[in-house]
Amino acid sequence: MKSSIIRFSVSLPQNLLETLDERLTHKGYSSRSEIVRDMIREKLNEEIWSSGAENTQGVAVLTIIYDHHQRELNQRMIDIQHTSTHKGNVEILCNTHVHLDQHNCLETIILRGNGVHIEDLSIEIGGLKGVKFSKLTRASRFE
């Protein structure tokens, strides 16, 4: 069901409006309404994820770069993902692996499930020896 659009006004200091308009132009938005809607969605999404509520459901992308020569690292990452999936806490939707160079690989893991468990999985994988970069992007929220 499509929700209706409601108009309302917002009062801003001139310098803040100018900054908003610069960002609107730079990012290619067609209107102030579009950029404000995106900013509101982003902020609400951040607040929901950061609430840590046990019933929070979400979708996220975990991006990691790691040294593929690190002993048993691949197996530990796979074990963590399988354990989380078998417990029913997190669903692994997709896993993409890219060889960056002789030593480093990049993986993206698309996750869906309980927000707290997604965060836990991210921290567990990110903390493994040999993981050089780890970032969880909270891609969307749904009820």
From Swiss-Prot:
One of its GO terms (biological process) is response to nickel cation. Keywords: DNA-binding, Metal-binding, Nickel, Transcription, Transcription regulation. Ni(2+) binds at H82, H97, H99, C105. The keyword DNA-binding applies. The keyword Transcription regulation applies. SUPFAM superfamilies: ACT-like, Ribbon-helix-helix. CDD domains: RHH_NikR_HicB-like. One of its GO terms (molecular function) is DNA binding. InterPro entries: Acetolactate_synth/TF_NikR_C, ACT-like_dom_sf, Arc_rbn_hlx_hlx, CopG, CopG/NikR_regulator, Ni_resp_reg_NikR, Ribbon_hlx_hlx, TF_NikR_Ni-bd_C. Binds 1 nickel ion per subunit. Its cofactor is Ni(2+). It comes from the Bacteria. Belongs to the transcriptional regulatory CopG/NikR family. PANTHER family: NICKEL-RESPONSIVE REGULATOR. Transcriptional regulator. This is Putative nickel-responsive regulator.
